[in-house]
Amino acid sequence: NKVLFIDGDIKRDVFLGKYKLGKNAKGVIDYLKNPNKNHEIICVTNHKGLDIIFTGINDDEIVTRDERDVFKNLLEKYSNDYDYIVVDTDEDGLLAQYCDKTMIIKDEEAYSVEDMNEEVNRLEADGCSILGVVIRE
């Protein structure tokens, strides 16, 4: 299976820093800010069948509603090339509504049933289809 992992957490560039690519790697933000430009945003990994699109550079950490709508186009653009597209989004789930299914992952110490029910209800109201919640230690 071919998998495309998209780092859609626009508030933090965890994966970009982890792979020590510096601040020059183009990614999701570059596509959202200028969708008509032909960006080379897919990074091929050394794991067969796994490619990554990093966050890219977002100096203001703001993505407009129109730019979020462009994210749907990004998913559609690559959906025929990959068996699965996995998106890591920010805590607000700004991009989750454009995904077919959503899985919420929470740290055990940050988990409460009340907060989780609130988050699930909010995401469902935004049009997300929630598969479930994973609580990690």
Residue map of PLM features:
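Short phosphate-binding/catalytic loops that engage adenosine nucleotides
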Residues: 1-2, 128
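Hydrophobic/aromatic beta-strand patches that form the interior of the parallel beta-sheet core
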Residues: 4-6, 51-53, 103, 131-134
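P-loop/Walker-type NTP enzyme "switch/lid" segment
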Residues: 5-80
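Conserved catalytic-core segment of NTP-binding enzymes
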Residues: 64-137
